[in-house]
Amino acid sequence: MHFASGIIRPPFEAGCAFLQVTSGCSHNRCAFCTYYKDARFAVSPMEEVEADLDELAAHPWRGYDRVWLQGADSFVLPYDRLMEIAELIHAKLPWVRSIGAFARVTNFCNKSVEQLRNLRDVGYARLTVGVETGDSALLARMHKGHDA
């Protein structure tokens, strides 16, 4: 398995299989976050993603039905790439029913409503979004890169 850093996920995702599709953070400017300050954002090559899925498929443990995409904001990936990843997951791990990931609020702005519905339909569900505040002035002070 290819992991650029340790496993980062919400506590309730502990029972998932983990698949790195990005590393680092595409924004990496939030005033309060130091976790990715020394890490450059990178997208995992599809060859690595596929090799990791092959490794998961070969493992005898099947006690999960969800895959968690590793990376600070894996949902930043373009729609076509997310669809390709979902297709590979379902082809190699047919027992998997859903896919989770961290997402920034801005990750939803570069996808149409139809694309978001399609992503939901192929299993993307319960994405974890960092919504620290609904106050635009505070978002600017925290360098979040979006407003309320």
Q: Model regions: which residues?
A:
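Canonical Radical SAM [4Fe-4S] cluster-binding loop centered on the CxxxCxxC motif
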Residues: 4-47
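Conserved SAM/AdoMet-binding glycine-rich loop
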Residues: 57-146
